[in-house]
Amino acid sequence: MNKSPLLFKGLISIGIFTLFAVLGMLHLGVQYIDPSFAALWYPYEIGLAVTAVALWYTLLRKEIALNFSINFNKDFFITLPIVLIPLLLLVYVLFTSETLENEKLAMFFATSVAVGIAEELTFRVAGYRVLLATGSSVKKAILLSALLFSLFHLSNIAAGQGVEIISQLAITFMMGVVLAYIYYKTESILYVIIIHFMWDLSLFIVTAFTNADSLLNAVSIPIVIGYFIWAMKNVLKLKK
């Protein structure tokens, strides 16, 4: 395999995806943390998901195959809480909120699915997998793809987000390490899409339908930090 063209195609995929996201942010002018974000953003996010699929299919498909099966092995069960905890948050909201609207729920669901597909294909496939296929070590590929994933969220500046973006960059870097490590261990793009989808769906619904933002932060931040520490310890032990 000629590695340079593949690396170039991976970078082109990430660049085009990021450009489209920034243009969408500039047009909408609504921040990611805004309760109305998902409702306004979902047509753009579906477009981004289609773009990510098209970029993989046209540029990367021949060199980077995708595995959609999920193996119920040790690594799956170790990481299962990262799926179940946002699910419990969603159940809590569904049973306690009196302001749920079916139309908004459908939009949040569609947006979250699209986010999971778009960002995992871009940063775990065009990022991590391409880096791995072009000679990077697993450790380097995980950390660099997580950094790219974090820096991508600078696009929120286009929507007017201020210094609070620093904390978002830190959280997204940690989550990027966790997702890339889980992808390395499971080799299942479907599983990391599901994790990404569940976290975004819980974020959108909790912020839109409740005043439980503090509960969301109290639950989600320790989980992300805990799994980041677990993933980083294992990443740093890797010899390849």
Language-model segments: residues:
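N-terminal membrane topogenic signal
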Residues: 1-15, 75-78, 137
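Alpha-helical transmembrane segments in multi-pass membrane proteins
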Residues: 6-58, 83, 106-107, 111, ...
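Membrane-interface helix caps and helix-loop-helix hairpins in membrane proteins
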Residues: 92-106, 156-163, 207-214
